[in-house]
Design a protein with these regions (language model features):
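Intracellular juxtamembrane helix-capping segments at the cytosolic ends
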Residues: 48, 129-143, 150-151, 351-364
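Central cavity-lining transmembrane alpha-helices of secondary-active solute carriers
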Residues: 64-79, 287-299
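Glycine-rich segments within core transmembrane alpha-helices of 12-TM secondary carriers
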Residues: 146-167, 374-388
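Extracytoplasmic gate region of multi-pass secondary transporters
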Residues: 41-46, 166, 233-300, 387-392
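C-terminal membrane-cytosol helix-exit motif in multi-pass small-molecule transporters
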Residues: 191-220, 423-431
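C-terminal transmembrane helical hairpin of 12-TM major facilitator-type secondary transporters
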Residues: 248-257, 281-356
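Helix-loop-helix hairpin linking two adjacent transmembrane segments in secondary transporters
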Residues: 158-209
């Protein structure tokens, strides 16, 4: 029998008596703030393109592959994470993410771009996926009385990673140089620094004992799986899963397209004006987008508790389409308008990620919702290819045709508007899951009575 002070046989080390659950959010943040560096990849794009003679499409490839591997490793590694626990998952994330930078450093030093793609994109991408899902699940277990806040904390950290990485990466490139040697040194420092920072999370993380104290009631309560739910396998057979897949894919495609190209995009939009954007200012813009991304994850997901998941996605997708139209039509006329619209879009992008677990819970219940979430993240993998591909391919073709400035992005912004409309329609098609898909978990406890007004509200959220 495992005691609270000894490592659990499955699921990793269990917290000893008296262990504060408030030590767990910093552990989760140390992982998510590190792997959130992926959102600052656009800072490296100009240096890679000039130092290694790459096109915009080529310089986006490591980022695209990293997002693909994030979704795939999250989808297929979820069972391993649950079986081996958060410390194992965080260790794997640390090793893969840091090694990815070290391999990329070797690739930059030897001008072998395929090593950068392999290191950052493939190896580092596995670290992204395993690291992304491990703190979310653990925090939900530690905070059964505040699951929305717990999810927001973890996913907010991922969104805020570039807030630190963007100016830090830009400063290193300024110091080391933007040639292949400077890029290699920057990658090397990133790999070593993130290894140290992520190790703090590995050391701090613990899984909760069987009972977690509810701070509001002061009582210790077990939180079992109750009532009916939908298994991960059955969820794949429902139209609701695929509607949400389209919703997430469209929302992420629209956000990730502008995020991956953020630094060069704002520079190109105002290159021909009296107030061009410097490299440092462009990096600052990326940091602002990361702040909006981070704030949206906790702000909009909390708002969804008040107005419902379906309504909040109506905001993400409907208002987001309007923001893209404003940028495409008037973005080059006003720098504040461009920045404001981009910030709103990135807040919706982050909010979409943070709200989707609750949306899944509303539709499919808590039984195997983590596995369902992991499978849904394949939409992120798809979007990680679509978004940058659309923006970069169109920009490259426009540049080859002799266009410059905002003309490089007009068509891609219009495409993003259309994708958000598709996502809006998919969200409108979401309905409650048919009872034939429900199963009773083998370890389920009798469900507590649900007040009628709350039951009706939860049902309405899926309408």
């Amino acid at each position: 029998m495992t005691t609270p002070s000894t490592p659990a046989r499955r699921g990793g080390p269990v917290a000893p008596p008296g262990w504060s659950r408030w030590l767990v959010p910093p552990a989760a943040l140390s992982i998510h703030l590190s792997i959130g560096q992926a959102y600052a990849w656009s800072v490296f794009k100009p240096a890679l393109e000039s130092g290694l003679d790459l096109t915009g499409t080529q310089s986006a490839l490591p980022f695209q592959l990293a997002i693909v591997m994030l979704g795939l490793s999250a989808a297929f590694g979820g069972t391993l994470v649950e079986r081996n626990g958060p410390r194992w998952a965080m260790t794997v994330s640390l090793l893969c993410f840091s090694s990815g930078f070290l391999i990329s450093a070797l690739g930059a030093a030897t001008s072998q771009y395929w090593l950068i793609v392999l290191g950052y994109g493939f190896v580092g991408g596995i670290g992204l996926g395993i690291g992304y899902i491990s703190p979310v699940s653990t925090l939900m277990k530690w905070f059964p009385d505040r699951p929305g806040m717990a999810t927001g904390i973890a996913i907010m950290g991922f969104g805020g990673g570039a807030l630190i990485a963007s100016p830090w990466s830009a400063a290193m490139l300024d110091s080391f140089g933007s040639d292949s040697r400077g890029i290699a040194l920057a990658f090397l420092v990133h790999g070593l620094a993130y290894a140290v920072f992520m190790s703090l999370g590995v050391l701090l993380i613990r899984t909760p004992a069987a009972r977690v104290k509810d701070e509001e009631s002061g009582e210790s309560a077990r939180v079992p799986v109750t009532g009916h739910g939908v298994s991960a396998r059955s969820a794949l057979r429902t139209p609701q899963f695929w509607c949400l897949w389209v919703v997430l894919c469209m929302n992420v495609t629209a956000g990730i397209g502008i995020l991956e190209k953020a630094a060069p995009m704002i520079s190109d939009f105002f290159a021909g004006t009296d107030t061009p954007v410097s490299v440092a200012a462009a990096a600052g813009f990326v940091a602002l987008l990361s702040a909006a991304n981070m704030a949206g994850r906790i702000g909009w997901s909390s708002t969804s508790d008040l107005i419902g998941r379906k309504n909040i996605y109506r905001v993400y997708l409907g208002v987001g389409a309007v923001m893209y139209l404003l940028i495409s039509q008037f973005g080059d006329a006003s720098k504040p308008l461009f920045i404001l619209c981009a910030l709103v879009l990135l807040s919706f992008y982050g909010g979409g990620f943070a709200t989707i677990p609750a949306y899944l819970k509303d539709l499919f219940g808590t039984y195997q919702v983590g596995a369902i979430h992991g499978r849904l993240l394949t939409a992120w993998s798809t979007a990680g290819v679509l978004g940058p591909l659309i923006v970069n391919q169109i920009a490259d073709r426009q540049a080859a045709a002799g266009h410059s400035g905002p003309e490089l992005y007009g068509l891609s912004l219009t495409v993003m508007t259309g994708l958000l409309v598709v996502g809006f329609i998919a969200n409108e098609l979401v309905r409650p899951v048919h009872p034939r898909h429900h199963v009773t978990p083998p370890d389920a406890a009798p469900a507590a009575p649900v007040p009628a007004h709350k039951e009706a509200a939860a049902h309405d959220d899926a309408r």
